[in-house]
Amino acid sequence: RRLLRDLNIEINQIIPEGGSVKDLKNLPKAWFNLIPYREVGLMTAMYLNKEYGMPYISTAPMGAVDMAEWIRQIQKNVNTLALSLSSKRVDYEPYIDGQTRFV
């Protein structure tokens, strides 16, 4: 959560944590899904991708290299989806550099 906050990304839902059946209606509102653990949530993400065209990221952000790749995938999804709303793009490379510089 902290990392997403650092990137100014608002979390729509965390499923199953604290979720209820009535919260499920909000799932299609997300721009994309993050699946930090492939064992949990991958089938749901695949379903949402099939039904709603919602992309998902299933790279586990464990270690500096995977975390950097995870953030780059987030950046790619945000920039792709933001094109329809604005010409503004995000660049998370300075954040990645700051987080991985001394590793």
UniProtKB/Swiss-Prot annotation:
Record key words, sorted: 4Fe-4S, ATP-binding, Chlorophyll biosynthesis, Chloroplast, Iron, Iron-sulfur, Metal-binding, Nucleotide-binding, Oxidoreductase, Photosynthesis, Plastid
GO molecular function annotations of the record: 4 iron, 4 sulfur cluster binding; ATP binding; metal ion binding; oxidoreductase activity
Record field: catalytic activity: chlorophyllide a + oxidized 2[4Fe-4S]-[ferredoxin] + 2 ADP + 2 phosphate = protochlorophyllide a + reduced 2[4Fe-4S]-[ferredoxin] + 2 ATP + 2 H2O
EC numbers, comma separated: 1.3.7.7
Compartment(s) where it occurs, according to its Swiss-Prot or TrEMBL record: Plastid, Chloroplast
Cofactor: record remark: Binds 1 [4Fe-4S] cluster per heterodimer. The cluster is bound at the heterodimer interface by residues from both subunits.
Needed co-factor(s): [4Fe-4S] cluster
GO annotation, cellular component aspect: chloroplast
A biological process term (GO) from this entry: photosynthesis
Pathway participation: Porphyrin-containing compound metabolism; chlorophyll biosynthesis (light-independent)
This protein's record includes keyword Zinc: no
Presence of keyword Methyltransferase: no
Gene3D superfamilies: Nitrogenase molybdenum iron protein domain (3.40.50.1980)
The organism's place on the tree of life at top rank: Eukaryota
Purpose of the protein: Component of the dark-operative protochlorophyllide reductase (DPOR) that uses Mg-ATP and reduced ferredoxin to reduce ring D of protochlorophyllide (Pchlide) to form chlorophyllide a (Chlide). This reaction is light-independent. The NB-protein (ChlN-ChlB) is the catalytic component of the complex.
Subunit note: Protochlorophyllide reductase is composed of three subunits; ChlL, ChlN and ChlB. Forms a heterotetramer of two ChlB and two ChlN subunits.
Stated family: Belongs to the ChlB/BchB/BchZ family.
Protein name: Light-independent protochlorophyllide reductase subunit B
Name of the gene encoding the protein in the UniProt record: chlB
